[in-house]
């Protein structure tokens, strides 16, 4: 979602990014990232760098752009995608956006990337996600 968010922010009213991979130039340096080089490529490879840079969401946040409302979801227990991706992307968007729409970070210090998350945490996250979307899309609930 990060790539479409930075490429065409005008197309969306609200975006939810769950456990996102946002910095395509440094992903391979954290957690499971080295295992994804075969799929994504590596910024350390001169031939692959331009392709990764071209769609790396973090590197295409533009100051003054009208970004939609965004909810990033991550947590300390994520052993796949480093939580730093969501944290730094949220901070960058908060600093750059010219819109009055919220850029929020839902951060759980005890759980992470799906599997192994207690059912009550899954439910809470689902409620938070749907509530955010209903709020930002101005959907009335009777």
Feature roles, as predicted:
Residues 1-142:
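Active-site-proximal cap/loop segments of hydrolase catalytic domains
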């Amino acid at each position: 979602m990060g790539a479409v968010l930075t490429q065409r922010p005008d197309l969306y009213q609200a975006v939810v990014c769950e456990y996102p991979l946002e910095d395509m130039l440094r992903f391979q340096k954290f957690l499971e990232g080295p295992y994804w080089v075969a799929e994504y490529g590596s910024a350390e490879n001169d031939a692959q760098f331009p392709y990764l840079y071209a769609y790396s969401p973090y590197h295409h946040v533009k100051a003054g752009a009208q970004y939609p409302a965004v909810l990033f979801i991550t947590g300390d227990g994520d052993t796949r995608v480093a939580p730093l991706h969501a944290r730094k992307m949220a901070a960058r968007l908060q600093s750059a956006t010219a819109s009055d729409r919220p850029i929020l970070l839902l951060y759980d210090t005890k759980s992470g990337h799906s599997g192994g998350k207690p059912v009550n945490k899954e439910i809470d996250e689902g409620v938070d996600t749907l509530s955010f979307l209903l709020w930002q899309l101005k959907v009335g609930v009777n």
